[in-house]
Structures are given as C-alpha cells and as structure tokens.
UniProtKB/Swiss-Prot annotation:
It comes from the Bacteria. One of its GO terms (cellular component) is cytosol. Pfam families: SAICAR_synt. It catalyses: 5-amino-1-(5-phospho-D-ribosyl)imidazole-4-carboxylate + L-aspartate + ATP = (2S)-2-[5-amino-1-(5-phospho-beta-D-ribosyl)imidazole-4-carboxamido]succinate + ADP + phosphate + 2 H(+). Belongs to the SAICAR synthetase family. It is an enzyme of class 6 (ligase). This is Phosphoribosylaminoimidazole-succinocarboxamide synthase. Its EC number is 6.3.2.6. The gene is purC.
Length: 236
C-alpha cells in the first residue's frame, strides 16, 4: 500500500491518501488538544497508545457485529482504514452524568443514567460542536432518517459491548462519542475509539483515566491511558 499526499489534518490525527481509492492511512500524532483546539500540547507516546488502543477496540466491535472502517495496523502510529463518506454528526452515549451534560443541566457529576442517553452534536469546531436533534440532521441534509436509525442502533450496540469490556477491566464507561460514515452504501463506524473520545473512571476510586486528566490539569495523562490499555490487554 503506497502512502500518498496528506488529505486532511485534524487536531490529533492526519489522513493520507493511498494508491487504493477505497483506503486511507490514519496517522495518530502526539498532539493533545482541549477546548476545541484552544489548548494544544505534545504528549510522548500518545499517538502510539491511541493507535493501538483504537485497533484493539475496533477489532472487538467487528467481532460483535459492528461494521468499522478499521482494516489493519501499519506501524506504531499508523493504521489502514476504509475511505468513508463521513456524516458530520457526533453521536454521544452517556451512562453517567459528566462533562457538558453536567454544565447544561446542572446535575451532579457521577449520577448513573438509566436508561443511557443518546445525543447528537454537529461536528463543527468553529461553532463549538452545537447540540442538535434528529430533525436538524434531516432538515439540513447532514444525514437521512434511515441513517440516523442505524447510527443510534450501532451506538447502543457499541455501548453494550464496551461497557462489559471495560467493566471486566475494573472501569466504568462514563460516556463516549462516535462518528459514522458511509462505505459502499453501508453505515460504518469511523474516526477512532480511544481515551481521547470517551470518559473512563476506575470502578472503585472513580479516578479519571481519560482525556479529562488533560482538560482538568490532573497530570499523568499518558500513564492513565497506558494503565487502561494494560487492564484491557492491549498490546503496546
């Protein structure tokens, strides 16, 4: 597989074309950002940890019947993925109250949500990824009603699979965001799944083991990521 020019550079990943029109290469960088890119730092080993963590999770989801864009690891910081036509919507599943939900509704952090909630946000950094609903997605042409049904179904399936996986590792899956795209007419899970895009707390101590350590200045960010990977059995 020949790596060609950079197609897109995000806050923490770069996307490259290949000699196959249906495949792209994702490069996980050490860049770590918060507050819609207003704060950016370099954290050693982060690209490698997130790349291998993402590969592990995507393979677990594939085994559970969730279609993903992941094909294979290419190295410590790179993987080969399917080229998706991305839907510009973030799907957020919450099992416990945290983050923007706490700020928006004034509820106490850590409350268990039963049932888990499903939310949509427009993927737009300039506008702060605003909270939207299903009718917005359809009315503005960001996706179809049928695609939304499938995205919600897959998001809840991911929650079912990963909640158990993390629970078995002594961790609470507090919340997470997913992005989807279309590959040959099928809705497929895209982007990544890593501690950058979810909240994970230790079951016993409620210690934060995710990107909130960076956002909140708690320190030991990569050490926490590596601890999560170790508990799951991710080969680093």
């Amino acid at each position: 597989m020949e790596k060609r020019e950079e197609l897109y550079r995000g806050k923490a990943k770069s996307v490259y074309k290949t000699d196959d029109a249906d495949r792209l290469i994702l490069l996980f960088r050490n860049d770590t950002s918060a507050f819609d890119g207003k704060r950016i730092e370099q954290l050693d080993r982060k690209g490698m940890v997130n790349n291998k963590f993402n590969a592990f999770i995507m393979q677990k989801l594939e085994e559970a019947g969730v279609p993903t864009q992941f094909d294979k690891l290419l190295g410590d910081n790179e993987c080969l993925v399917k080229k998706l036509d991305m839907i510009p919507v973030e799907c957020v599943v919450r099992n416990y109250a945290a983050g923007s939900l706490v700020k928006r509704l004034g509820v106490e952090e850590g409350i268990k949500l039963e049932p888990s909630t499903f939310e949509l946000f427009l993927k737009n950094d300039e506008k702060g990824d605003p909270f939207i609903n299903e009718s917005h997605v359809v009315a503005f042409g960001w996706g179809t009603a049928e695609q939304l049904v499938e995205m919600k179904k897959l998001s809840l399936k991911v929650n079912e699979v990963l909640s158990k996986l993390f629970d078995d590792a002594g961790l609470l899956l507090v919340d997470f965001k997913l992005e989807f795209g279309v590959f040959h007419g099928q809705i497929v899970l895209g982007d990544e799944f890593s501690p950058d895009g979810c909240r994970l707390w230790d079951k016993e101590t409620r210690k934060k083991m995710d990107k909130d350590r960076f956002r909140q200045g708690l320190g030991d960010v990569i050490e926490a990521y590596e601890e999560v990977a170790k508990r799951l059995g991710v080969p680093l």
